[in-house]
Amino acid sequence: MPGKDIVVKQAIESVMGSTRKGRNKIIRLVQKNHPHLGASKIRRVYERSGFSLSKKWRRRMKDNPANPISIPLVANEEWAIDFMCDVLEEGRQIRTLNVIDHFNRQCMGISVDYSLPSRKVIEALERIIEQHGKPIRIRTDNGSEFCSKRFQLWLRENKIEWSRIQKGKPQQNAIVERFNKTYREDVLDANLFSSLAHARELTTKWLWDYNNERLHESLNYLTPIAYAA
């Protein structure tokens, strides 16, 4: 590797840290520290160096039966929830909790915080339920927050069914995964957040547009709000 590329590689490594960041976010952070480096050069070194988002290995859980998605005919029949991670300009990690109604692809809410343990997950869901009503089922992956005793007790007390996807089968949560991709491209990777408040502000603005203005092919080219009307 040429000497100049080694310098770029070291600059990339210095901003990657241990938190999840997309390629575009990496490029922006490198350029913030090294304004003289062009985006195309950083991208080339990034790709040639084989940088990728690493996966954490968790303790193996007993698997559950296949759980394919069935699109509901009414709202509040099944929600899907999932986490995402990003990083502030200062380097501190943030997390988001995304809640989607499978019926009309509406995003019921996005909680943005430094950490989102099961307690905060429950608080976020209770705020959404207060505004939109209670779902029959909630679909999740096998994350520790969802498998926790606190979250499982809350589901039972509220008579909400838990629809857990199989480990290693993200396609069983394809609707929220597709939403996550859009949110990452439009918001997380497109911006450098100066603070938690900044991330929340941009997320709130984008969320309104997503629900009220963005047309969805799967909804006959209607917005989520219009489809549910």
Where on the chain are the PLM-derived regions?
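Basic, flexible linker segments flanking DNA-binding modules
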Residues: 1-78, 169-170, 223-229
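Two-metal-ion RNase H-like nuclease active-site motif
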Residues: 77-86
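Active-site beta-loop-alpha junctions of metal-dependent nucleic acid enzymes
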Residues: 88, 92, 110-132
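Short loop/turn microsegments at loop-to-beta-strand junctions
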Residues: 94-96
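Short, acidic, Ser/Thr-enriched surface-loop or helix-capping motifs
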Residues: 101-102
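Acidic/histidine-rich, metal-coordinating catalytic segments
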Residues: 125, 132-148, 222-225
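RNase H-like polynucleotidyl transferase catalytic core
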Residues: 138-142, 157-175, 191-196
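C-terminal domain-tail junction helix/linker
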Residues: 158-160, 181-229
